[in-house]
């Protein structure tokens, strides 16, 4: 299983509450349309702090790298990416394989 971590910084004209609403209520509609996306988890800080390097860390799960590539290159994947770029000022991605050590 592949897990993509997407670390995002919101655009400066969005409050953390506005960003949270967009991500959990609006952007998730795009995620639901992405083929092969098995799980989508959003992690948002409880409080706004200038010390936070990111305003959200999203987890996207796929069966394998081919499924991930297919998802991101699909029309739904491109639409999701465009929606994200309209609301964020920066994004970093890390493609990982999860190793659960304690459950």
Name what the model sees in each region.
Residues 1-103:
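Macromolecular interaction modules
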